[in-house]
Amino acid sequence: MKKAQIKKSVSALAMAAVIAVSLFGYGCGAKPASTSSDAGVSGDFTGTAKGFGGDVSVTLTLTDGAITGCTAEGKDETQGVGSEAIAKMPGEIAESGSIAVDGVSGATVTSTAIKEAAAAALTAAGLNPDDYKTAVENNATAEDSTVDADVVVVGAGGAGMTAAITAAGEGKSVVILESQSMVGGNSVRATGGMNAGKTVYQDENEFGESAGVEKTLKTAAEKYADNETITALAKTVSEQWAAYQANPTGYFDSVELMELDTMIGGKGINDPELVETLCANSADAIDWLDEHGITLHNVSSFGGASVKRIHRPVNAEGKTVSVGSYMIPLLQENCEKAGVKMMLDTTATEILTDANGAAVGVKATGASGEIVTVNAKAVVLASGGFGANLDMVVKYKPELKGFMTTNAPGIQGQGIEMAEAIGAATVDMDQIQIHPTVEANTAALITEGLRGDGAILINEEGQRFIDEVGTRDVVSAAEIAQTGSYSWLVVDQAMVDASSVIQGYIKKGYTVTGATYEELGKAMGVDAAAFAETMEKWNGYVEAKNDPDFGRTSFANPLNTAPYYAVKVTAGVHHTMGGLKINANTEVLNEKGEVIPGLFAAGEVTGGVHGANRLGGNAVADFTVFGRIAGAAASDYAA
């Protein structure tokens, strides 16, 4: 088993999340707006508006009717997304004297709430908010600039920041170029956790997933007998499973079982070498995150995994939280500690090459149109896939026209296109994943972890229709085939009590509720009697640990603690499995299969890791494992 050699940089970091900001005289290069204010009004006035996660409040300081200060609070806004708007916009309002400042890209709901709350504060002061909506002219100018670095990273998501931290830990100077006004990319939107095989945290759980292992081995034998990689992995896992049954010590999992699950999930078209690299380095990646103050110790079930393998963060109360909004601020903190230079609102447009075709830097465009040239010894592309570029999605998969997307606005495929321009090869570009649990009204991603923790899916007829913890492609296809192409994700109060994530969904207004099964059925608008019967039947299946209807093998607890909740979900574009062709050292390859010197890539910008379908939890594993490898490889190349 090959295992990428990655040097560890040990530092335990802690981060205090600040989401209340008071800024006066904030300098942003904007021209102060003129207003027709009441010159007699001075003091502090507060307004409130509905944000993404809860209420957002804004307090304006008025001096003779002019805005001279602004603070904002929104403790329930998503860390790393809405919190960025709360950190940035108050200062711009204070300096410009206008509430018509630009919002933060990717944090539209929170940005709008800040403006509405500011308007409410003006109303509370007896003023007309319309008098404070003068458009803010950005007269800031910037000159073209050149920056020199050992390593330049394109994209400040999970893969990019992991690569930067690793390279900086090797003593290299690192610059990150990020097209958006905040870090995180798609990574900050990740809700579940990180898959890792054979970790010490799995051993803290009692093993009860025999049926899952047997089901996977049966699938390998019946559906993939002609796939040499899957057959060989299944043989190894069968031997490991027999040995474990003879001496059941600890929790059963292995690198090979994780590989087998990943290959089956990807329908056998994954690059076996990349899958092996992903899985062999996953447990070490959990340890690396620990060393950097990022703890993913709660282990649970997830779609497509034979055993409990997904590692999740919890809050101070022990409740699970979304992995992306937890990890990204901590990775950003690690970047700052490591001395990484972060250039936001700077969009990479071209990979610079020398006479021999080696990557030697990146050209980018800044927020004011200035040209930024970064000369570097190595280039790491970590700019994400193309799930937010719906034209590009439809180009490669026309049947997805009209689908909503869970992707961040900056996920446009630029990294792929830049690399193609210098001869890079791509793979699996038509493999685009749709996710079955996307909130039907807002396109917000509803975590797959709920199904792993016991939630079920119900159709308009009040019935289950699929093994809820199957792979995303299978569950999505079944959901699309239902009446109206949607379903309801059902949980009970016991699940709510254990998850701050579900509590967040309730606060955001995603759920309907009922004190009884019949009441919830009516609230959902499904056949209430049939739904009640389905719930009673399902609870019996959980007690018996047997699902004769759809063969589900992952069971948690019965859904029998009132009240009950449901979220209406549908399928949406979620992940692009295709991208740049790389080897196990994250070196980008050209059409001849040759390495493009100095060019590395990690994360969703690459292809081959996930095949035809990505398993939930493997994206975080992907960006952590390959981000580390890319950072180390780029560092070695730049030596």
Located regions from the model:
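Active-site- and interface-proximal helix/loop "cap" or "latch" segments in soluble metabolic
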Residues: 36-136
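Beta1/beta-strand and adjacent pyrophosphate-binding region of the FAD-binding site
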Residues: 141-159, 175
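Glycine-rich FAD pyrophosphate-binding loop
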Residues: 169-190, 207
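An anion/pyrophosphate-binding glycine-rich loop and adjacent beta-alpha core
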Residues: 220-234, 412, 416-420, 425-528
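Conserved redox-cofactor binding core of oxidoreductases
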Residues: 253-370, 389-391, 542-561
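A glycine-rich dinucleotide-binding beta-alpha-beta segment and adjacent secondary-structure elements
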Residues: 350, 530-613
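Glycine-rich loop(s) and the adjacent beta-strand/alpha-helix scaffold that form part
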Residues: 367-439, 626-629
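Internal hydrophobic alpha-helix adjacent to the cofactor/substrate pocket in enzyme cavities
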Residues: 418-425, 527, 532-535, 622-639
